[in-house]
């Protein structure tokens, strides 16, 4: 009986740890030094993560990265789908130790024979109707919906802890097409986002965009005017449903 109970209890414990990191986090310390020259925000949701970084004293975009993650006890693994600074990481896994100390994430590993330690402070773990990792699977033009199946080339949008980040990339060719992120709210059918970083055009930082949203059969229908002033109607599907990994 004890052996039978061990496996489900371990699974439950690991699931609770994974849920504990869901939300948005800000990098505060790196190798014992306070991070004040850049702003790095990381979002965890549904077994996926993404981060975006910009200069602290300007709106200049620095970098972005993300992919799937797994947690077992304090054994933490990141599997990269995109990384703007280190393309060689795409398609690889990096192992870390992760501890939760006083509500902060302490992530550590060894690099070049020396310890590398990051401390992340929780921004928020709030959830709403759109809290999820999404992948775009459809668009509506002239009352006609066209569908697509995400492959190596895909666009994701991760929302959790009051933060959002979209990323367009190709995990096979390692091509990065763009990203943007910031804060958002989703209430009474209105989705509002405020841009805090944008890789394609720093001048759009600070802009606030309002859209209509509706969740239909588990999919996010997103409509309104884009940041360029063009009408859009997008359909976003839960990432784990919309994107299927190719068989090895």
Model-based region annotation:
Residues 18-64, 70-179, 187, 192-248:
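Lipid interaction determinants
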């Amino acid at each position: 009986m004890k052996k039978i109970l061990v496996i489900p209890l371990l699974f439950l414990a690991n699931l609770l740890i994974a849920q504990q990191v869901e939300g948005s986090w800000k990098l505060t310390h790196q190798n014992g030094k306070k991070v004040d020259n850049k702003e790095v925000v990381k979002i965890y949701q549904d077994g996926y993560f993404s981060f975006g970084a910009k200069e602290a004293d300007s709106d200049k975009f620095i970098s972005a990265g993300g992919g799937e993650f797994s947690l077992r006890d304090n054994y933490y693994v990141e599997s990269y789908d995109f990384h703007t600074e280190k393309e060689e990481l795409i398609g690889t896994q990096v192992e870390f130790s992760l501890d939760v100390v006083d509500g902060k994430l302490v992530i550590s590993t060894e690099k070049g024979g020396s310890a590398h330690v990051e401390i992340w402070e929780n921004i928020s773990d709030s959830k709403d109707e759109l809290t999820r990792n999404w992948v775009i699977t459809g668009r509506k033009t002239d009352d006609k919906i066209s569908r697509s199946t995400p492959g190596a080339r895909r666009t994701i949008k991760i929302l959790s802890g009051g933060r959002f980040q979209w990323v367009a990339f190709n995990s096979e060719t390692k091509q990065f097409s763009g990203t943007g992120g910031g804060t958002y709210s989703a209430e009474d059918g209105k989705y509002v986002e405020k841009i805090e970083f944008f890789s394609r055009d720093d001048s759009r930082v600070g802009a606030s965009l309002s859209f209509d949203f509706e969740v239909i059969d588990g999919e996010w229908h997103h409509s309104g005017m884009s940041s360029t002033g063009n009408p859009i109607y997008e359909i976003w599907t839960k990432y784990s449903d919309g994107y299927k990994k190719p068989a090895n």
